[in-house]
C-alpha cells in the first residue's frame, strides 16, 4: 500500500511527466488538478484528481480547486504532533508529503504587447498555487515543496538517496526549498503590486 502522497499542479509542464513518473516509481501516490492531471494520465500514470480528495468539484472556471481543508490539513498537520494526527484521522484527511507547484505567468502576461485586457490579466493571478506553496513551505519539516522545474533533478536525487522516504531527506535541502518557495511567492506578489501601483500613479 502506497503511503506517501505528492500533489502536482503546474502551469509550466516541461519535465513534469518524468518527475511524476520517477516519484510514482518510488512508491508515491499522485494527486493532481485540471490540465496537469490530464497530462499525467495521458502519459499512463495513475493519478487521483484533487476533487476526489476534497469531495468538491473544481469550480468557477478553475478558480477554486485546492482551496479546501482536505488539502491544507494534509499539508500543515505536523507529523510528530499526536493531536494533529488524531484530528487528521478524525476528519478523514490524509497527509500530503510533497507539493510540486509553479504559478500562472502573471508577469509574462502583463508584459505582452499589445497589452491584454484586464479580465485576461486578472485570470493570471494565482490564488491556490501560492497558498499551497506557503502551506508546504511553513511545514517544511514534513513536506517537500518544489516550485520550479529546475529543482526536479535535485529533489529526485535526494529522494532516490533516501529510498523514496520523504522523512529521510536532508533537512538543509528542505530549508533551501522552503526559502526558494517563499522567494517565489514574494516575487509573484511584488510583480502584481508593482504593476497596479504604476497604473494607479497614471490616474
List PLM regions with ranges.
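Short coil/turn connectors at secondary-structure junctions
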Residues: 2-5, 26-28, 43-46, 69-72, ...
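General beta-strand structural signal in soluble alpha/beta enzymes
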Residues: 8, 29-34, 49-52, 77, ...
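Conserved small/polar residues in nucleotide/adenosyl-binding loops
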Residues: 193-202
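Short acidic-hydrophobic catalytic motif
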Residues: 181
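A short, charged helix-loop
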Residues: 101-120, 127, 131-164, 168
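N-terminal glycine-/serine-/threonine-rich phosphate-binding loop
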Residues: 1-32, 36-49
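Glycine-rich nucleotide/cofactor/substrate-binding loop typically near the N-terminus or early
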Residues: 35-106
